[in-house]
Amino acid sequence: TIAEYMLPALLGDFGARYPEVTIHLRVSNSEGIVSMVENNTIDLGVVEAPVGNKNLVVEMCREDHLVAIVPPNHDLANLETLEIKKLLEYPFICREEGSGTREVINEYLENNSCDTAMDISMELGSPEAVKGAVEAGMGVSVVSRATIQKELKLDTLRAINLMPKLERPFSFVHQKQKFRLRAMEELLDFARGYCEDHAEEQL
């Protein structure tokens, strides 16, 4: 989610300011990103789920707002707010195990006394696949509002706010020791400033 919807703008601005720095971007789910940071495969990760490894440094960037999505012709399409129990009466399309979105939704279900063993009709590996399946009428889902701006404008999906609301932090994660390259310190400092400057934007 993050790599597709937040990082391009951040890295574009960074590249314009530091044209001599080459950045190699890898996309994975939160579990995969944490593993790559642990193994020093990457220097800096951005994740959307809690990080259990206490040996890593985790810094929150900003809050992300998650919403229920349904196709425009769905029974729930005209609602403004919705309790998660009502949404779970319909076939549910979710991300794969290890995804930050899946982990956050499971935690939300537990906190709201819902069974995490819901009626899952599909497990898919990307936000685009989830959106496509919901658009095709194969079920309902919960996604980051940041991922559906185009679909909302085209009216191929409807977003419904969950009650209570569902938010999660986007966080940077890295090793405690200093970065091997000075450019990584500059990137992290730039990213911190970018998050502060864009904190009020709708995600």
Q: Which stretches of residues belong to each language-model region?
A:
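Flexible hinge/capping segments at coil-to-helix
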Residues: N53-I93, E97, R182
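A late-sequence structural motif
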Residues: I2, M6, R158-E201
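Secondary-structure junction motif
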Residues: F92-N112, L181-R182, H198-L203
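Short beta-strand->loop
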Residues: V57-V67, D119, I148, K153-L166
